[in-house]
Amino acid sequence: IRLHKTNFKPYSKKKILKKIKLETKNSKLSINDGFEKMNKLVKLSKILVFTYPSTGFLEAIRSNVPCLMLWKNFDLEIDISAKKNFENLRKHEIIFTSEKKLSKKVNKIWNKIDLWWYEKNIQRNLRKFKNKYCNGKINLNKIYREINKIA
């Protein structure tokens, strides 16, 4: 699980990991504090879990790497022009606004992540999303700023 490198106070990495392991009953999870290179994490991971909207999430989608995202302030932060496309990822349980629902999803798919990720309906919806946000030569930082209403 990759945390934002500056945005998880007052909890330490250790406290967050303990809480997640208790809720998921999965001792194999690990926490990344946001400083490690993404390509190294991808090689070591069954699934990537993002705790905030980021270019890393878009890169994972673009590369077709199994991933989930927790976006607690989705309804407040999402730009109206992008909402429909991101709502579709929420509908297909790739984006979550609740830690508890995200945790349940991880538990449900843990032993069959590839089966879930490569299911036709999931891949079809990911393709639609990629065609809109992750196609060809793109500036992922620019897209991220547009989606999140950042000037």
Question: At which residue positions do the language-model features occur?
Answer:
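Short acidic alpha-helix that forms the nucleotide-activated donor recognition element
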Residues: 34-45, 62
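Catalytic binding pocket for nucleotide-activated donors in carbohydrate/polymer assembly enzymes
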Residues: 18-26, 47, 52-133
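C-terminal alpha-helical cap of glycosyltransferases
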Residues: 131-151
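Gly/Ser/Thr-rich loops at beta-strand to alpha-helix junctions
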Residues: 7-8, 54-55, 136
